[in-house]
């Protein structure tokens, strides 16, 4: 079994030293879903929400969050991201919004946390913008879809 990389031999949390690691292209994709009533989803789709374009706001929030992950998650490294994408898709058949994020850089550590943070904050932004209309929305199934680059190789969710 692999060891936790952020815990030293004394059991103390520390930031991982990546100074001797090779720079490689790192890519990560993550997703999240927001489940809601059909009426709430239709309000988002039609653009009739009184706060404005929900998808545009959530997209920008997700991008901003990816760039600030190191400030939110203890022990994450500040990264020079070369690409952040946040895609939002309305799924009327399940009354959900699907969010997919992609983060990319050339560096010494991965971008999984940045991708997960982007998807999560985009979902939280949808909730925030729509909570006046519906408070029982559910943010669910936040997960890493893909990561590549680095010593640990490639990962693809099933």
UniProtKB/Swiss-Prot annotation:
Enzyme class: lyase
GO molecular function terms listed in the Swiss-Prot or TrEMBL record: cyclic pyranopterin monophosphate synthase activity; GTP 3',8'-cyclase activity
Residues where substrate binds: 75-77, 113-114
Catalyzed chemical reaction(s): (8S)-3',8-cyclo-7,8-dihydroguanosine 5'-triphosphate = cyclic pyranopterin phosphate + diphosphate
Cysteines paired by S-S bonds: none
The keyword rRNA-binding belongs to this UniProt entry's keyword annotation: no
The keyword Transmembrane helix is assigned to this record: no
Coiled-coil region(s): none
A single GO BP: Mo-molybdopterin cofactor biosynthetic process
InterPro entries linked to this entry: MoaC, MoaC_bact/euk, MoaC_sf, MoCo_biosynth_MoaA/MoaC, Mopterin_CF_biosynth-C_dom
Its job: Catalyzes the conversion of (8S)-3',8-cyclo-7,8-dihydroguanosine 5'-triphosphate to cyclic pyranopterin monophosphate (cPMP).
Listed name of the protein: Cyclic pyranopterin monophosphate synthase
Organism: Actinobacillus pleuropneumoniae serotype 5b (strain L20)
This protein's encoding gene: moaC
